[in-house]
A protein has these predicted regions:
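Bacterial N-terminal signal peptides that target proteins for export
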Residues: 1-8
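C-terminal segment of classical bacterial N-terminal signal peptides
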Residues: 14-21
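Sequence context surrounding c-type heme c attachment/ligation sites in exported
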Residues: 26-149
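N-terminal leader/targeting peptides and immediately adjacent processing regions
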Residues: 7, 21-27
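Active-site-proximal loop/hinge segments that shape catalytic or ion-binding/gating pockets
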Residues: 11
Length: 149
């Protein structure tokens, strides 16, 4: 009876361990695919904002800019230690080596988007402001933290 009980415990523990490993792996996949989707979405939104600002459609651009800001803040949660490789990630290892600097850049990007929303109706050269407050952050990230294409 005691041996059967121990066998049951062993089988049950093995089952839960296998499920935990599979779930962890699935979570890594979800994290990497999730961050890729957020970056891809922000790229599409940035292009849309660019068009709207060229046409001086500031009111239409504002909610998109707020969405982009929120996306950058959300990205702070998408780079855990166990998500450095796999699933087509384009993230370079330097992200984890310079985690504080990377997180600061994501926060700066979020803050700069809010700043853009705040000043876009008041500036003389909206395109220059847009490049400074948005594209500069995109370029900083891509040039340091993303695999070249």
């Amino acid at each position: 009876m005691k041996n059967k009980f121990l066998l049951f415990i062993f089988v049950a523990a093995s089952f839960f361990n296998i499920n935990f490993i599979a779930h962890s792996e699935e979570s890594i996949e979800d994290i990497i695919k999730g961050r890729k989707a957020i970056f891809s979405n922000n790229a599409k939104l940035a292009k849309r904002v660019n068009i709207l600002l060229r046409e001086f459609e500031v009111e239409e651009a504002e909610p998109i800019i707020f969405e982009m800001s929120k996306n950058y803040e959300n990205l702070l949660n998408y780079f855990p230690e166990n998500s450095k490789e796999g699933y087509g990630t384009e993230a370079l290892p330097i992200i984890w080596e310079e985690k504080d600097a990377f997180n600061a850049l994501m926060q700066k990007a979020a803050d700069d988007m809010l700043q853009l929303a705040k000043v876009m109706e008041e500036v003389d050269d909206i395109q220059a402001t847009y490049k400074k407050l948005m594209w500069a952050n995109c370029n900083a990230c891509h040039s340091r933290y993303r695999k070249p294409h």
